[in-house]
């Protein structure tokens, strides 16, 4: 997990796909289990922002892969796309995917010499209200900065100054607040069945298929129920669920 922390402190867009199977250790290598959620939420040394997106079926997994990369670049952070093993090793016939739904979002990109120091280093980690600093492209004039595994100034220079440390930590963590505000509700959770039903099942991952089928069978018997499928595990959609 050292690589996750390195990407986190350097605000490097990174997407990791994790297929869950039974543990611990070798555990149940050919069986599906939802036992890695705490791992992806907490893996790494110290704290850094991460977004965790969970797909419920193969169609979602296709579109979510593109969404995960957009999150990573938009918020310049680690994104974990988490799937149950039952989905990762599953074969299923599906209608052709709608490629028109796929959008590529590169996030905030710095303009050449846009920071007023054409010959100097670029403040890659300048403090911003959103926590996101425009990133320079490779070779961009005036875009030089430093990337290390240590805490750093706005230019990337290693420092152990407690004031700078606090500022940079808070800057990075503000990204989760920004993401929570900007990510559409449909990407955070989805509701299946009768929206007004008093009986609610709260679930995530590959349980979706069996639950949706069960709700349909209950409806045939005159029993109203609904599934709330949580898709965004971090930042967790508390206001939307309330």
Task: Give the residues covered by each predicted segment.
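A short small-residue
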Residues: 46-49, 151-153
């Amino acid at each position: 997990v050292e690589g996750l922390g390195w990407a986190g402190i350097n605000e490097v867009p990174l997407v990791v796909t994790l297929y869950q199977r039974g543990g611990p250790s070798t555990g149940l290598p050919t069986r599906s289990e939802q036992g890695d959620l705490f791992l992806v939420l907490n893996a790494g040394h110290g704290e850094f922002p991460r977004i965790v997106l969970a797909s419920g079926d193969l169609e979602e997994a296709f579109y979510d892969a593109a969404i995960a990369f957009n999150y990573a670049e938009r918020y310049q952070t680690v994104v974990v796309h988490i799937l149950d093993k039952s989905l990762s090793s599953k074969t299923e016939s599906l209608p052709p995917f709608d490629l028109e739904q796929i959008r590529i979002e590169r996030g905030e990109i710095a303009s050449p010499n846009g920071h007023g120091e054409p010959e100097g280093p670029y403040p890659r980690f300048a403090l911003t209200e959103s926590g996101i600093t425009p990133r320079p492209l490779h070779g961009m004039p005036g875009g030089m900065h430093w990337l290390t595994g240590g805490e750093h100034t706005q230019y990337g220079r290693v420092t152990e100054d407690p004031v700078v440390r606090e500022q940079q930590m808070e800057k990075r963590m503000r990204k989760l607040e920004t993401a929570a505000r900007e990510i559409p509700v449909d990407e955070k959770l989805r509701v299946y069945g009768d929206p007004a039903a008093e009986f609610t099942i709260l679930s995530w991952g590959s349980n979706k298929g069996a639950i949706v089928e069960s709700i349909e069978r209950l409806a045939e018997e005159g029993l109203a129920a609904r599934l709330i499928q949580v898709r965004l595990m971090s930042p967790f959609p508390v206001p939307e669920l309330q």
